[in-house]
Amino acid sequence: MLKLNLQFFASKKGVSSTKNGRDSESKRLGAKRADGQYVSGGSILYRQRGTKIYPGENVGRGGDDTLFAKIDGVVKFERKGRDKKQVSVYAVAE
């Protein structure tokens, strides 16, 4: 009696899939104007999530916590107490 030892191979190669390969778009957060820089009213000063920096004098806070200048003037980043920071805009005397 003949015994045949046959081994069959897959006719198609197994294809693996991955759940990686994508990333969210960066939100471009952070300072948009530097300390001592002249800005016009409505200019965005700082984009943030939450209140990393608080609004100071002549600075407003938008719905997404973006800080913007209310008047034309010079930007000043300052400390507010021990552990907080704020940004203010001061009018320039002419």
UniProtKB/Swiss-Prot annotation:
UniProt GO BP = translation
InterPro entries, A to Z: Ribosomal_bL27 (IPR001684), Ribosomal_bL27_CS (IPR018261)
Single GO MF descriptor: structural constituent of ribosome
Q: Cellular component per GO?
A: cytosolic large ribosomal subunit
Q: Print the keywords alphabetically.
A: Ribonucleoprotein, Ribosomal protein
Mark which residues the record calls propeptide.
Answer: 1-9
Q: Its domain of life?
A: Bacteria
Family to which this protein belongs: Belongs to the bacterial ribosomal protein bL27 family.
Q: What is this protein called?
A: Large ribosomal subunit protein bL27
The record lists the organism as: Staphylococcus epidermidis (strain ATCC 35984 / DSM 28319 / BCRC 17069 / CCUG 31568 / BM 3577 / RP62A)
> What is the organism lineage in this UniProt record?
Bacteria, Bacillati, Bacillota, Bacilli, Bacillales
